[in-house]
């Protein structure tokens, strides 16, 4: 998502480094070009601002698309297709940019979409239908399509055969290379967060103070918000005891 992640990717992980940012800082862009192989832009304006630099550096440029097709329920904060989203270029935005094929497309090697979050391949299929309807006329004019992350490929109920069919279909229909970002699936259920109860108290409810923090160790719990699974636990009132779990920090809302 910018200079520091690009540097980390290139220096620590190696291989092909892709970077995306909703907008790039001018004073950082030349250094980003030293690390990134693919630079994905969020808007046509960013392509026009930096596209020539990317081309001269011998790197590849992409444009993030917003197919305006929400497949998530109840998690607008993680939905790039939510109304008012700043993530990606919509079809009306392309129309407003003028002659796309003459002014923007010559700088592009690919298109990028990231619309999923912990989802199955049926939602990817729904997204692709919308993306092809809006932008499919240009897919065969680029080298690659990056379908982003959010694919829960390692989940037991994930339909991998459908995913294979979709990827093969894109390659055959448009002659493009297809990227999938690894995302959470590569480490799904690979470990546990272990915590201990330091103290218990009561203030209108039973509260357990832990030696771990939602804000510090699991920020998605507060930002999304969501309730992470706890081994042996149940819903409120289901078990003999019901406790709220809180962290040791001074943040009042640091609760799981």
PLM regions with names:
Residues 1-144, 156-158, 166-169:
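Active-site-proximal beta-alpha core segment in soluble small-molecule metabolic enzymes
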Residues 62, 146, 178-180:
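A structural signal for short, well-ordered beta-strand segments and their strand-loop junctions
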Residues 68-70, 118, 152, 215-217, ...:
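Short, acidic Gly/Pro/Ser/Thr-rich loop/turn segments
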Residues 89, 111, 149-151, 184, ...:
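Gly/Ser/Thr-rich helix-start
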Residues 115-116, 145-154, 182-185:
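Glycine-rich beta-strand-to-loop/alpha-helix junction loops that act as flexible
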Residues 166, 177-256:
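Charged (often Lys/Glu-rich) extended helix/loop segments that serve as interaction or gating elements
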């Amino acid at each position: 998502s910018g200079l520091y992640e690009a540097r980390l990717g290139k220096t620590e992980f190696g291989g092909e480094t892709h970077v995306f940012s909703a907008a790039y800082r001018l004073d950082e862009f030349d250094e980003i070009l030293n690390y990134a192989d693919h630079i994905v832009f969020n808007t046509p304006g960013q392509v026009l601002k930096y596209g020539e630099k990317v081309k001269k550096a011998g790197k590849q440029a992409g444009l993030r698309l917003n197919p305006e097709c929400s497949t998530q329920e109840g998690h607008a904060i993680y939905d790039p297709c939510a109304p008012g989203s700043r993530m990606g270029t919509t079809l009306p935005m392309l129309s407003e940019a003028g002659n796309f094929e003459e002014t923007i497309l010559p700088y592009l090697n690919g298109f990028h979409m990231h619309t999923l979050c912990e989802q199955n391949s049926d939602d990817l299929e729904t997204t692709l239908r919308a993306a092809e309807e809006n932008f499919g006329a240009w897919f065969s004019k680029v080298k690659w399509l990056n379908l982003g992350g959010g694919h829960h490929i390692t989940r037991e109920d994930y339909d991998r055969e459908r995913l294979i069919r979709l990827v093969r279909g894109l390659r055959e229909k448009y002659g493009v290379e297809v990227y999938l970002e690894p995302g959470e699936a590569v480490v799904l259920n690979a470990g546990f967060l272990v915590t201990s109860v330091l103290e218990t108290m009561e203030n209108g409810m039973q509260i357990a103070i832990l030696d771990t923090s939602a804000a510090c160790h699991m920020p998605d719990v507060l930002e999304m918000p969501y309730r992470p699974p706890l081994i042996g636990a149940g819903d409120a009132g289901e078990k003999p005891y019901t406790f709220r779990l809180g962290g040791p920090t001074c943040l009042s809302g640091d609760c799981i």
